[in-house]
């Protein structure tokens, strides 16, 4: 059973402007929004702005799927990359909201093309 659905689109140029701007501002943004593992993954890629944009879209989509819980922090939502498809780890307020909703599984898909990054998050319950 689908308990929540979130979709978000981010312009890669928006993230590129932040990364190319004043270093202190870029660092504050990255530290506030992305976990160390996310930063390491994105910074190791030539298209780092695209990778950051996709992860930012995933976090926005997750917040929408969770019903925009009060107090959720960007670092409560972490896009993980194993050997296969990306996944989304929830912590803190986001994890609490998911538990209250009865979420059994979080589905995440990311894509990027034509200067935009798109993410969709589906929250699935244990029911039929």
UniProtKB/Swiss-Prot annotation:
Family label: Belongs to the P-Pant transferase superfamily. AcpS family.
Record's subcellular location: Cytoplasm
GO biological process, any: fatty acid biosynthetic process
Binding site for Mg(2+): 8, 60
Keyword Glycoprotein: no
InterPro entries registered for this protein in UniProt: 4-PPantetheinyl_Trfase_dom (IPR008278), 4-PPantetheinyl_Trfase_dom_sf (IPR037143), ACPS (IPR002582), Ppantetheine-prot_Trfase_dom (IPR004568)
Protein's job: Transfers the 4'-phosphopantetheine moiety from coenzyme A to a Ser of acyl-carrier-protein.
Classification of source organism: Bacteria, Pseudomonadati, Myxococcota, Myxococcia, Myxococcales
Principal location class: cytoplasm
Cofactor: Mg(2+)
Protein name as catalogued: Holo-[acyl-carrier-protein] synthase
Cellular compartments per GO CC: cytoplasm
Cited HAMAP family: AcpS
Recorded catalytic activity of this chain's protein: apo-[ACP] + CoA = holo-[ACP] + adenosine 3',5'-bisphosphate + H(+)
Presence of keyword Magnesium: yes
GO function terms (MF aspect): holo-[acyl-carrier-protein] synthase activity; magnesium ion binding
Keywords assigned: Cytoplasm, Fatty acid biosynthesis, Fatty acid metabolism, Lipid biosynthesis, Lipid metabolism, Magnesium, Metal-binding, Transferase
EC numbers on record: 2.7.8.7
